[in-house]
Amino acid sequence: MTTNQRSIKAPQTVVVKLGTSVLTGGTLALDRAHMVELARQCAELKKQGHSVVIVTSGAIAAGREHLGYPALPNAISSKQLLAAVGQSRLIQVWESLFAIYGIKIGQMLLTRADLDDRERFLNARDTINALVENGIVPVVNENDAVATNEIKVGDNDNLSALVGILCGADKLLLLTDQKGLFTADPRKDPNAQLIKEVTTIDDTLRKIAGGSGTTLGTGGMATKLQAADIARRAGIEVIIAAGRAPNVIFDSLSDEPQGTRFLALEEALENRKRWILAGPAASGDIVIDDGAVKAVQTKGSSLLAKGVVRVQGQFARGEVVRVLDKQSHLIARGIAAYSNDELAQIAGKHSKEIIDILGYDHGSEVIHRDDMVVIQE
């Protein structure tokens, strides 16, 4: 079947995440021949009326190649040096390859700080949407040259999920050096079977994903599973597929794609809750009892002080926190109505007691249900 015969009928916004292993083919240099093929497929998508956003790895590999593979110490500063040199080289390669098909690109470098603050989050969203609306392909990467651990997203798998939320994507393609998610590591177990479709992400699946990435990249199957979970909750279908297979982008978007397809949740989150889910790094944790877990998960209730067991970390009123059960399983993310100091005083108390304990109150809810995203299946 030809590329044109694989045409996708309904216009879609597609985020294509390209890992280092896909761009280098396992070598130490960018594989421009394969990159031009990926650009061709993206160009074909645009010709058919779809919008394409690229999340690209490879800056460090490009920097190492450009500098002649220097022997550098294994330090953050070395990686930032390589990223600083390589990012410009990487974007030049993409610019030249897309130019073959008459397509202009726009570079966007993001850090966690750009997503933590809602106003900056919305500004990033407006920029990426403006590029798409003007026929320009956004090429996104994390700003590794300046990002520290405190402001890093950490890997381009999770970054691509956040970008998908920013641009309201219909599909997210996580292209990697594996054919998809298997029942075991196919590099170690010859009996490993490809999982074709996923409707629920549970602890068993997380255990299967395990492991880390390649020596050149930062992401492995575990981070892809995290990214898939974030994206599908925002109404984005996710496909993990082999990035060097022929016509992989078109095959991934067919009715029966190669690889593993993660179905989007039917009830997609509203925009504010998408930001709570994807934007800010959690400032602290609120541990709740079993009754509160049931109320939050099954009844859609707000979290009250009565159900709080303890707090962990430091956070101010209005910051995003994680909600955990007593076994430290993630139950929800939400915006705290009280600081950690305030919560420590009112934990386990009835709402009517708050004003007597603190001398004031910010309402009866510790986290209002409109400010909370339930995570557990």
Swiss-Prot record:
Substrate binds at residues 57, 144, 156. Keywords: Amino-acid biosynthesis, ATP-binding, Cytoplasm, Kinase, Nucleotide-binding, Proline biosynthesis, Transferase. Its main location: cytoplasm. Coiled coil: none annotated. ATP binds at residues 17, 176-177, 218-224. The keyword Secreted does not apply. It catalyses: L-glutamate + ATP = L-glutamyl 5-phosphate + ADP. The keyword Zinc does not apply. It is found in: Cytoplasm. PROSITE patterns: GLUTAMATE_5_KINASE, PUA. Residues 283-361 form the PUA domain. One of its GO terms (biological process) is proline biosynthetic process. GO terms for molecular function: ATP binding; glutamate 5-kinase activity; RNA binding. Pathway: Amino-acid biosynthesis; L-proline biosynthesis; L-glutamate 5-semialdehyde from L-glutamate: step 1/2. One of its GO terms (cellular component) is cytosol. Its EC number is 2.7.2.11. Belongs to the glutamate 5-kinase family. PANTHER family: GLUTAMATE 5-KINASE, ISOPENTENYL PHOSPHATE KINASE. Catalyzes the transfer of a phosphate group to glutamate to form L-glutamate 5-phosphate. This is Glutamate 5-kinase. It comes from Vibrio cholerae serotype O1 (strain ATCC 39315 / El Tor Inaba N16961).
